[in-house]
């Protein structure tokens, strides 16, 4: 699973998901890509599940690029804990994703194989996505 090696601070504010993605919204490396249509937090487990699904489907050929990285810690309080006594401890990492962001890219495979592999990865995501091809 992906997570930062070290961070400046252990805990972060939740923030809010406003607007559309201005960076990371164009295909840079491959020919085919999976693009988000909704804002969300995508966990490192979901990113890894999508990546594994794609690599299994493509097998030998092709190359896959993961364009997002989970750099936001999410804290969780223990079950049945009273209110107060500070913020919970960091439990897992998420990538903050806005509409238009590219999640995965793929190259070196025919379109039908890429479409199939990316659709399987899309089913692992908690949001609506679309398959795009670079011009």
UniProtKB/Swiss-Prot annotation:
InterPro entries given in the database record: Ribosomal_uL16, Ribosomal_uL16_bact-type, Ribosomal_uL16_CS, Ribosomal_uL16_dom, Ribosomal_uL16_sf
Q: Where in the cell is it found?
A: Plastid, Chloroplast
Tell me the keywords, alphabetical order: Chloroplast, Plastid, Ribonucleoprotein, Ribosomal protein
Family, per the entry?
Belongs to the universal ribosomal protein uL16 family.
| Pfam families reported in the protein's UniProt record | Ribosomal_L16
* PROSITE patterns the record matches: RIBOSOMAL_L16_1 (PS00586), RIBOSOMAL_L16_2 (PS00701)
What are the annotated GO cellular component locations? Answer: chloroplast; chloroplast envelope; chloroplast stroma; plastid; ribonucleoprotein complex; ribosome
Mention one GO molecular function.
Answer: structural constituent of ribosome
For this entry, list what GO says about its biological process. translation
Put simply, this protein is called Large ribosomal subunit protein uL16c
UniProt subunit comment: Part of the 50S ribosomal subunit.
């Amino acid at each position: 699973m992906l997570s930062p090696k070290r961070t400046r601070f252990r805990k972060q504010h939740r923030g809010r998901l406003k607007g559309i993605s201005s960076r990371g919204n164009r295909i840079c490396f491959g020919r085919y890509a999976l693009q988000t249509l909704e804002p969300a937090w995508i966990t490192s487990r979901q990113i890894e599940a999508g990546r594994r699904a794609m690599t299994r489907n493509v097998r030998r050929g092709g190359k896959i690029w993961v364009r997002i990285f989970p750099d936001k810690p999410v804290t969780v309080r223990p079950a049945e804990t009273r209110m107060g006594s500070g913020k919970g401890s960091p439990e897992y990492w998420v990538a903050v994703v806005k509409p238009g962001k590219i999640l995965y890219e793929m190259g070196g495979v025919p379109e039908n194989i890429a479409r199939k592999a990316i659709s399987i990865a899309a089913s692992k995501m908690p949001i609506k996505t679309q398959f795009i091809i670079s011009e």
